[in-house]
Structure formats: C-alpha cells, structure tokens
Amino acid sequence: GTEYIVCAQKGLRMRKKPDIRGEYMQMLPDGAVITVLEEQAGWFKTTYKGYTGWVSAEYCCKATGND
C-alpha cells in the first residue's frame, strides 16, 4: 500500500467503518506513519498497533520518500 503520515495536531480517530458514525477504536497520533490498504469515499483502511480500521483521508498527508 501507499504510505501516508497523519497530519492532525490533535490526532486522528480510527473507526470500525468508513463512516463518521463508525465505532471509535483508537487515536492515531500526529506524525504517525500508516500504510493504506484500501480507499473508500474519503476514508483510508489501515492497520496501526494491531488494530485495523478506517481513518479520514482528509487528515493524511502523502509520505515523501524514495519512490
């Protein structure tokens, strides 16, 4: 998958579904590096610290690296 960095000063909520009403799972800190597994309607599916869920793509910046 593509790597992104969480760009949300207050952190980014991971949810069970790609929906703002989806059940809250955990908070991803600002600057966390995530790998996007799937993309759906402005949401990214990712795994972080053993949890797999959805985060808002709006608060993710593409990681710049050696591509």
Residue ranges and their predicted role:
Residues 1-16, 26-30, 37-40, 59-67:
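SH3-family beta-barrel domains
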Residues 31, 44-48:
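SH3/SH3-like beta-barrel fold
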Residues 36-37, 45:
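Short C-terminal domain-edge/linker segments immediately following a structured domain
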Residues 42-44, 54:
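Conserved tryptophan-centered aromatic signature that marks the ligand-binding surface of SH3
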Residues 49-60:
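A short macromolecule-binding patch
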